[in-house]
Every structure is written in C-alpha cells, then in structure tokens.
Regions:
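Short, surface-exposed beta-strand/strand-loop-strand elements in extracellular ectodomains
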Residues: 72-81
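Carboxylate/His-rich catalytic cores and anion/metal-binding grooves
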Residues: 212-215, 226
Length: 345
C-alpha cells in the first residue's frame, strides 16, 4: 500500500493502478485513452552466413554480427573503411561474441573471422527507409509513475519479430525483482533518430541473436526519452505483469531472471550520458526501487530463481559487474555511485 511519504511496502504488486499512473503523483487508475494511427518504416533485414563479403538489396544502417569462439574473434569492414575488430558489444552470449555496428547507408560489408572462430552470422538492418506501415499509438502520453515513456507501438515495434514459425520465440516468464543493471547500447552518440536505433537493436536481439525480443526492459536516449523494451503482456504495465513480477529479458547472460536492464543509447566509454539521460535514469531507478522496496545504495546477494546460482552485487550495478564486458562504458560506470545516491533520495 502507498504510505503518506509515497513509499510502498516491499514486494507490493505494481498493478496498472499503482505503477502506470498517468498523473505524476497520483496513484489513481489512468483514464482510458484512444489510439492514433502513426506510420513507421518497416524494418528490413538481410542475413548472411560465414566470413567474406555480403551485399544487400537496400542501404543498411546497422550490421549485426554473431560468432562462436573467442570474444575478439571477428572483424568487420565497410566500403572504403578500415577493418574494425569486433570485441563484443553490450549484448553477451554464452560462447563467442556479438556486435551491432553502425553502417551509415552501406549496401555491402565484409566480415573476417579469426582462427578458431566458427558459426559466423551477420544481419544487415535498415530501420529508416522500408515501406511504411501503420501502428496504433496511444493518443495520450504514457507514464511510469511520472516518468513519461514511449510504448512499444510508439517506437514502431513490429510484434511479429517475437514469433518464430508461428509461435512466440521466447514466452514470457516472470520473477520477483531483485536487482537493476545499467548498460550502454554501444551505438553512435549524437543519434539523430534514436527510435530507429531502438528498432535496430530490437531486430538485432530478436533475429540475429534469436532472443525473440529486445534484450532490455527500458532504453533511454540522449534527450532523456524512455522507451519500453521487452514485451511484458497486454496489461499496460511496462516490464512487469499485473502481479508485480518482472518479465525475464536478455541483457545479462545467466543472470536475467529477476534482473531489470536499462540501456542508455550511445557509447559511454570516453564520455558520460547527457544530463537529460542521466536524470531519466535516476528517476526511473528511483520509481522502480520505491515501488518494489529496493534500496538503490545497498548490496544484495542475487539468486537466480531458475537455477539457484548466486552472485553478490550492488542493487544497482553495471553490466561489467556480472560478466566480462566493457558495458556500460567506463565513464558511465564511474557515475553509478552518484546515480545510486540520487535514486535513493
């Protein structure tokens, strides 16, 4: 229940009444609102297997690559460019590496595999120039307890990507929230079309990596806009079901169940997030922590509810605290103490 200070008892369910209130301070049920038709370009993709040169029938804005073997086992070259070693981006897999590379508007690219690297697969992705299709977007702003966010329809999520051979590729499973993990997307900074980048990440995760959906629960762009990530059901509660349990996503391999992932768009290795992005990150962590009884400054022993594996981490951690990765970038990682303190106030 909600107390006078706005706190909620630990473990309280995040129902639409409590968690997705339209009013920034009210706990009342949001009024039903209609939808508005909005057009988005259809995401086009072209898959290739093995090393060598691949060509596409369209101008690709991103290329996703997946391989087995060493984490640094592949490289990619665009026309008139140099070879770029792919050391594995934010997305992590059990064997080998994977990377999503901005490709401008290329119609060809070349992939090179190191000795011992196998099962090289790539996917050219275009999220800006495909045939237009219409989505039903909520007419009124959607909010997570005062945090305005773009719902999946509002950023153009093609729900057919969640299906494989006519069935849901990764059926939704729900567990109690234990921790929050911060990522960066390792995509270019100064993004002129962040919604298109979110669609590219979705295609990369759902199709290239065969996860069946985008791997994060929320994403945040440089303007501070929050995007709904992993599909969690039809109850209008992002990330959670109506009982208050977190849908399992795919952002931290081996530690996903009960672990909420937030990705900041961009590369935050040598530069930090914008003030707007950091403010949205703090606000989102604060809201979720308050309503699920988490202390953003505490340390916890995470217990994977699926297999019992445990790990001691901060309640709000960086991706690198879990696995071998540079994510969320050194500069962002150095800011996590500040983010925790701000979210706890």
């Amino acid at each position: 229940m909600i107390g006078a200070a706005g706190a909620v008892a630990a473990g309280a369910a995040l129902t639409p009444v409590v968690f997705a209130a339209t009013d920034s301070d009210s706990g009342s049920q949001p009024e039903a609102s209609g939808t508005t038709p909005e057009e988005f370009p259809t995401t086009r993709s072209d898959a290739a297997t093995g090393a060598g040169t691949a060509t596409t029938a369209f101008a690709a804005s991103y290329v996703g690559v997946r391989w087995a073997g060493a984490r640094d086992g592949a490289a990619l070259r665009l026309p008139d460019g140099d070879w770029r070693t792919l050391s594995g981006g934010c997305a992590t897999v059990d064997d080998g590496g994977t990377a999503l590379v901005a490709a401008g508007s290329t119609t060809s690219y070349e992939v090179k595999a190191a000795d011992g690297t196998t099962d090289v697969r790539s996917l050219a992705i275009d999220t800006t120039d495909g045939p237009r299709r219409t989505f039903k977007v909520p007419s009124e702003p959607t909010r997570v307890r005062g945090v305005r966010y773009q719902s999946r329809p509002a950023w153009g999520a093609d729900e057919s990507k969640r299906y494989k051979n006519g069935v849901v590729n990764s059926p939704e499973k729900y567990y109690a929230l234990q921790t929050i993990t911060v990522h960066h997307s390792d995509t270019p900074n100064g993004d002129a079309d962040p919604a298109a980048t979110v669609r590219a990440i979705y295609e990369y995760h759902a199709v290239t990596l065969d996860w069946g959906d985008i791997g994060y629960h929320f994403l945040i762009d440089e303007a501070g806009t929050v995007y709904e990530g992993r599909y969690s059901g039809d109850d209008n509660v992002p990330a959670f079901n109506s009982d208050g349990d977190l849908v399992t996503a795919f952002h931290t391999s081996g530690y996903n169940s009960g672990n909420l992932g937030i990705a900041l768009l961009g590369t935050l290795t040598d530069q930090g997030p914008t003030d707007a992005a950091k403010a949205s990150l703090v606000r989102l962590i604060k809201v979720i922590s308050r309503f699920k009884g988490l202390d953003p400054q505490a340390k916890v022993t995470f217990t994977n509810p699926v297999n019992g594996v445990t790990k001691d981490v901060e309640t709000v951690s960086g991706h690198r605290d879990w696995l071998e990765t540079d994510c969320p970038g050194q500069t962002m990682y150095d800011l996590l103490t500040e983010v925790r303190a701000a979210a706890a106030r």
